[in-house]
């Protein structure tokens, strides 16, 4: 009885540790996720290369993704623009840019089982964008009281 009780307690402890670890992974900082998925403030990237970083944390290749060629600080400034309704029509924490930026649109053309080997079509453009913003979390830098958490669209 003693070893089984010890095993069950050990299993319970390991399970609790796993749940807490997964919870912390699930509570990924949304602003960091936004930065990884949507900010590319250099020259136009090749989607095959930059999507490897985005897909690294996903179970399958992302079908489409848009990169804004601007700085995170410039997107944070857009969070200070007047609130507008988001595309899903239920949230009102979106903000539209007042200036156009270069964007790169990545469209999945060849999915694979290994997410880092997916192939994408790369298209460049110049557009305005709309982002959803939220108050920063304790994990965010205190430099910004409000941070972008979702790219709601380009227009």
Swiss-Prot record:
EC number annotated for this UniProt entry: 4.6.1.18
Secretion signal span: 1-25
Binding site for substrate: 33, 62-66
GO molecular function: lyase activity; nucleic acid binding; ribonuclease A activity
Subcellular location: Lysosome; Cytoplasmic granule
Positions carrying 3'-nitrotyrosine: 57
Cellular component terms per the entry's GO annotation: lysosome
Pfam families xref list: RnaseA
Coiled coil: none
Active-site residues, as the UniProt record annotates them: 38, 150
Residues listed as glycosylation sites in the UniProt record: 41, 83, 88, 107
Keywords associated with the record: Disulfide bond, Endonuclease, Glycoprotein, Hydrolase, Lyase, Lysosome, Nitration, Nuclease, Signal
Record-annotated disulphide pairs: 47-106, 61-118, 79-133, 86-94
Catalytic activity: an [RNA] containing cytidine + H2O = an [RNA]-3'-cytidine-3'-phosphate + a 5'-hydroxy-ribonucleotide-3'-[RNA]; an [RNA] containing uridine + H2O = an [RNA]-3'-uridine-3'-phosphate + a 5'-hydroxy-ribonucleotide-3'-[RNA]
Domain of life: Eukaryota
Subunit comment: Interacts with and forms a tight 1:1 complex with RNH1. Dimerization of two such complexes may occur.
Biological function: This is a non-secretory ribonuclease. It is a pyrimidine specific nuclease with a slight preference for U. Cytotoxin and helminthotoxin. Possesses a wide variety of biological activities.
Family, similarity comment: Belongs to the pancreatic ribonuclease family.
Protein name: Non-secretory ribonuclease
Gene name of the encoded protein: Rnase2
């Amino acid at each position: 009885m003693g070893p089984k009780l010890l095993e069950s307690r050990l299993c319970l402890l390991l399970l609790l540790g796993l749940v807490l670890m997964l919870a912390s992974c699930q509570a990924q900082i949304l602003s960091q996720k936004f930065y990884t998925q949507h900010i590319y403030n250099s020259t136009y990237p090749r989607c095959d290369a930059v999507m490897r970083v985005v897909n690294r944390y996903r179970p399958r290749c992302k079908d489409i993704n848009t990169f804004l060629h601007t700085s995170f600080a410039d997107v944070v400034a857009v969070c200070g623009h007047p609130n507008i309704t988001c595309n899903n029509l239920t949230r009102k924490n979106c903000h539209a840019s007042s200036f156009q930026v270069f964007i790169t649109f990545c469209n999945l053309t060849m999915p694979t089982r290994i997410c880092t080997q997916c192939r994408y079509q790369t298209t460049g453009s110049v557009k305005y964008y709309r982002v959803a913003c939220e108050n920063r979390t304790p994990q965010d830098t205190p430099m910004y009281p409000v941070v972008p958490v979702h790219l709601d669209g380009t227009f």
